[in-house]
C-alpha cells in the first residue's frame, strides 16, 4: 500500500497534535506491515517483495516511529511462510544483514538472530540448509554464535537449535545442524544436553504409551484426521537419538545415567542392548557406531550434506530428505 505522507488535520480543522500524528503513523504501519506479511504469505515474486519492502512496507520501531523492514525481518517472514526463493535472495544479497538480530519488536531478548531456531521450529529444511551454507563464509566466532545461539530463557527455555530439533522431533534439521558444526554438548536452561532432553522425552513417551485398544482407536483417528501418531513420533525420536550418537563421543552422565540404570530392562527394550550399554557407560560403542562416528567427522561443513552421497550410509539415514524439497 502507498504510504500516506499528507499531514493530518484535527477535529476543528487545525494541524493535528503530536499524539494524533503518532497514532496515525502507527495505524499506517500496521496496515503496511500486514500488507507485506500477506505478500510474503502469498509467495509473490521476489522483485515485487523487494519493491514493497523498499518503498511501501513499514513497521513501528521501539520508539513508535515508522521504520523500514530490514533484510533480517523480511527473512523472518520468508521463514514463517516457507518462501524459499525470497529467503535465498535475502541470504545471497544481504548475508550478514539477513542473519543479524531483528529490531526489538521482532524479538523478546537480546540473543543473536533467531533465524536458525525459527527454521528448525517451522521445519524449513531447504531454507535452513541455505542459512547454514551462508554462515560457512562468516568468521568462526560469528558462525559459532549463530549455530549455538541460546534462546530466550522465558520463551525458549534457554536451549539451542539442537534442543528445538529434539523437542519437536526434526531429524532432518538436527542432522544438518550437526553436520555444520553445531555443538551437541551445550545445556539448556534446565541443565539438559540435547541427548539428555531426548532421553527424557523418550521416557515420557514410553510412560504414556497407549494400550492396544487405545492404539487401534488412535490408528483409525489418525487415518481420518491425518495426524501424527505417538508411535511415529517415537520412531522419529529414536532416529534423532541415532543421529546424536554419531556426534557424541561419550554417553550420558549424572542424573540421566542414574535414570538409565534405574530401570535397565525398560530402557534395553526401548533402545536396544548395544545402545543402552554405551549410553549408560557400561560398554564402549559398537565397532559400527565407532566407524560411523569417525566417518561423519571426516566430512567438512562445506561439503555437507552433498558428501553423504559418497558414503555407505546405514539404512536409517537413507530416507532423510536434506534438500527441503520433499
UniProtKB/Swiss-Prot annotation:
The keyword Repeat applies. Keywords: ANK repeat, Cytoplasm, Cytoplasmic vesicle, Hydrolase, Repeat, Ubl conjugation pathway. A motif (Important role in both nutrient sensing and binding/regulation of IMPDH2) lies at residues 108-109. It comes from the Eukaryota. ANK repeats lie at residues 70-99, 111-140, 157-186. One of its GO terms (biological process) is intracellular copper ion homeostasis. GO terms for molecular function: hydrolase activity; ubiquitin-like ligase-substrate adaptor activity. The keyword Acetylation does not apply. It is found in: Cytoplasmic vesicle; Cytoplasm, Cytosol. Pathway: Protein modification; protein ubiquitination. InterPro entries: Ankyrin_rpt, Ankyrin_rpt-contain_sf, E3_Ligase-Neurotoxin. Residues 1-20 are annotated as: Disordered. Its main location: cytoplasm. Gene3D superfamilies: Ankyrin repeat-containing domain. One of its GO terms (cellular component) is cytosol. Substrate receptor subunit of a cullin-RING superfamily E3 ligase complex (CUL5-based E3 ubiquitin ligase complex) which mediates the ubiquitination and subsequent proteasomal degradation of target proteins. Depending of the metabolic state of the cell, promotes the proteasomal degradation of IMPDH2, the rate-limiting enzyme in GTP biosynthesis or protects IMPDH2 by stabilizing IMPDH2 filaments assembly. Implicated in different cellular processes, like copper homeostasis and cell proliferation. PANTHER family: ANKYRIN DOMAIN-CONTAINING, ANKYRIN REPEAT DOMAIN-CONTAINING PROTEIN 9. Part of an E3 ubiquitin-protein ligase complex with Elongin BC (ELOB and ELOC), CUL5 and ANKRD9. Interacts with IMPDH2; leading to ubiquitination of IMPDH2 and its subsequent proteasomal degradation. This is Ankyrin repeat domain-containing protein 9. It comes from Mus musculus. The gene is Ankrd9.
Amino acid at each position: 500500500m502507498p504510504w500516506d505522507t499528507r499531514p493530518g488535520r484535527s477535529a476543528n480543522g487545525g494541524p493535528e497534535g503530536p499524539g494524533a500524528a503518532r497514532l496515525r503513523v502507527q495505524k499506517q504501519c500496521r496496515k503496511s506491515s500486514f500488507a507485506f506479511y500477506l505478500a510474503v504469505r502469498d509467495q509473490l515474486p521476489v522483485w515485487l517483495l523487494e519493491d514493497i519492502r523498499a518503498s511501501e512496507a513499514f513497521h513501528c520501531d521501539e520508539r513508535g516511529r515508522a521504520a523500514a523492514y530490514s533484510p533480517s525481518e523480511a527473512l523472518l517472514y520468508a521463514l514463517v511462510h516457507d518462501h524459499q526463493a525470497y529467503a535465498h535472495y535475502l541470504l545471497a544479497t544481504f548475508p550478514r544483514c539477513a542473519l543479524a538480530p531483528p529490531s526489538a519488536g521482532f524479538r523478546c531478548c537480546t540473543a543473536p538472530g533467531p533465524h536458525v531456531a525459527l527454521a528448525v521450529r517451522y521445519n524449513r529444511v531447504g531454507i535452513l540448509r541455505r542459512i547454514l551454507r551462508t554462515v560457512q563464509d562468516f568468521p568462526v566466532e560469528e558462525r559459532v554464535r549463530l549455530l549455538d545461539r541460546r534462546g530466550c530463557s522465558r520463551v525458549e527455555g534457554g536451549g539451542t537449535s539442537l534442543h528445538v530439533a529434539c523437542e519437536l522431533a526434526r531429524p532432518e534439521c538436527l542432522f544438518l545442524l550437526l553436520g555444520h558444526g553445531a555443538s551437541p554438548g551445550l545445556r539448556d536452561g534446565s541443565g539438559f544436553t540435547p541427548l539428555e532432553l531426548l532421553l527424557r522425552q523418550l521416557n515420557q513417551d514410553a510412560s504414556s504409551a497407549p494400550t492396544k485398544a487405545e492404539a487401534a482407536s488412535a490408528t483409525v483417528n489418525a487415518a481420518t484426521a491425518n495426524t501424527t501418531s505417538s508411535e511415529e513420533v517415537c520412531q522419529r525420536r529414536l532416529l534423532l537419538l541415532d543421529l546424536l550418537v554419531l556426534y557424541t563421543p561419550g554417553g550420558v552422565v549424572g542424573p540421566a545415567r542414574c535414570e538409565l540404570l534405574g530401570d535397565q530392562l525398560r530402557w534395553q527394550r526401548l533402545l536396544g542392548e548395544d545402545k543402552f550399554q554405551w549410553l549408560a557407560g557400561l560398554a564402549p560403542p559398537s565397532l559400527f557406531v565407532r566407524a560411523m562416528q569417525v566417518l561423519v567427522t571426516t566430512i567438512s561443513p562445506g561439503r555437507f550434506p552433498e558428501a553423504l552421497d559418497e558414503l555407505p550410509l546405514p539404512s536409517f539415514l537413507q530416507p532423510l530428505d536434506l534438500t527441503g524439497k520433499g
